[in-house]
Every structure is written in C-alpha cells, then in structure tokens.
Amino acid sequence: YHRVEEEDAQAALQAAWDAGLRYFDTAPQYGLGLAEQRVGRAIARFGNTLTLSTKVGRLLKDCAPKDVTPEAFVDVPQKRIVFDYTYDGVMRSYDDSIARLGSDRIDILLLHDIDAGTHGQDGEDRNLRELFSGGGYRALNELREAGRIAAIGAGVNTWQICEKLLGEGAFDCFLLAGRYTLLEQDPLETFLPLCTKRD
C-alpha cells in the first residue's frame, strides 16, 4: 500500500460512477475511517441514485501514535480498532459511520469479519454471543425497522458463518469475499441454496 491523495481517491470514485457503478461499499476499517470520509464526499456529488453499504463490528478509538492499529494502510487517521458486536457497539459504529460519511443515508449495514477467519473459533463464538445475546442483532433490527437502513447482512471471508447467521436471524444479504469462484465451489452445496430458499 501507499499514500493515496484525496484528488486521486475522488477521481477513482468518479470514474466508477461514470462507468455506471451504482453500488459503493466501505467500512470503518478501510483507512481507519478515511475511506468512509472519502466515499461520503463522493456520494454527496452523486445524489440518491446509488446503494451504499458500510460495516459494523470495528469501533475506531483515538489513541497515541504507538497504539495505532497496525494495518497496511498508509497515512491514515491515528486510531486503534476495538471489535464490538454488542447492541451499544453496533449503534456506536452506525453513528460514527454516519458522522464520517457526512450523510444520514446508509442502505445496507453489514457485520464485518465476525467469523473465525479473523478471530479464531473462540473469537467467533464470543462474537456470536455478543451479537445474539449482547443485543447486536437487536440493534441491527431496530435500525432496519426504523427505516434508518434498508437491509442487514455480513461482509465476511467465509461462507460458513453466513449459514450460521441465517440459522439465527433474518438477514437480507451477504458480501462474501472470494469464497465462490471458478476454483472454490463449496458454497453451492448448502449455503447458496439456503439463500435462494430464504429469498
């Protein structure tokens, strides 16, 4: 990775828009908040004819330079990541994203990296307890029912956690990174048929 200037980021977002892309995804993790700020400035120009998703599960906390979360991003805000999938964590993450985006509009709110691929199996189990017993899922539902978001889901790197989530709640969509490809077809066995069944 290397430093990306604001004008280069805006030019890339504009090129995507000009090419016809109307779905933009971001997250607090990306650039430790900088990506949401930049996407927010772009969508202010684009208007309401797009779909925007961001993610919950990582809170960004101010910190000393020595405590910045070691990510691969370069020249980003001085923040450390705290994972939190509880009711308060989801609500705080949503509010913080709204502030960084400079807009009250988020269409899809995705649980970010809640799975064992990021946290190990014990961590995944803890995260699911936070989500379903600690109120994180209730927070997502409240936001959806209040019309503050249109859909809830998960942005993850393993399809197995998506199956678990579908077994526990009414999720609308999943952003599955690289787990269904020409070479990796396992999701076809149970996960994608379950998605079809659940509409």
Ranges and model annotations:
Residues I98-G123:
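Active-site groove signature of glycoside hydrolases
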Residues R22-Y23, T49-K55, R105-L110, I149-G153, ...:
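Structural preference for beta-strand elements that scaffold enzyme active sites
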Residues D62-I81, G117-D125, L194-D199:
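Glycine-rich, positively charged active-site loop/lid region within alpha/beta enzyme cores that binds
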Residues Y1-E7, D75-M91, D125-L128:
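Active-site mouth loops of central-metabolism enzymes
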Residues E7-Q10, Q29-L32, A42, I114-D199:
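Beta/alpha (TIM)-barrel catalytic core signal, keyed to glycine-rich beta->alpha loops juxtaposed to Asp/Glu
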Residues R3-A16, T86-R100, N157-K164:
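Short, acidic/polar
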Residues A15-G20, D96-R105, A139-A151, R198:
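A structural motif corresponding to the C-terminal end of an alpha-helix
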Residues Y1-D62:
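N-terminal binding-site loop/beta-alpha segment at the start of enzyme catalytic domains
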